[in-house]
Amino acid sequence: MSLTTYNLIWNLLELILPNYLERRKKSGKEDIHRIHERYGISKKNRPAGTLVWLHGTSVGESVAALALANSMRKNGYGNNGNEYFLLTTNTITAAKLIKDKIKKGLPAIHQYHPYDHPKVVSKFLDHWQPNMAVFLESDFWPNLIYLTTTFIIMFGELFHLMNEWGGFVGNS
């Protein structure tokens, strides 16, 4: 499927997205106070300084993102008061995990992953303006990946490696 076709589908989905979100809110799968983040709108300001965006969809990928953030901190990143992490997730459970780490001193902000509509992703990127992005996930979000690579230079996709590591770790 081409990106044009994919975006046409997103334009059609825009019409039913509010109903879909309402059902997810009622079933407890969405944080009712943070739905705006799914549309690329944040109530939080971007901190001044360097911002590294780490994205992991669910708990397992968020654990990997936190491990990467901790490794970066051990190597000096985030210790001078002018370097931060933006951690994005898709699930409430992963968000709670990240929130606990932030309370323990991780210089980070958590946001929910924006929907993959090009306008939403652009709004998200315009607001956060990350200096670097690393996606630690197995899902594929065409607009998020494409627009991120056009927005910033330092971008990494670790989901292929995670699949390899998952097989290795699972066998140990």
Q: Over which residues does each language-model region extend?
A:
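Active-site and donor-binding regions of nucleotide-sugar-utilizing enzymes
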Residues: 18-172
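Short hydrophobic helices that act as membrane-entry/anchoring signals
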Residues: 2-25
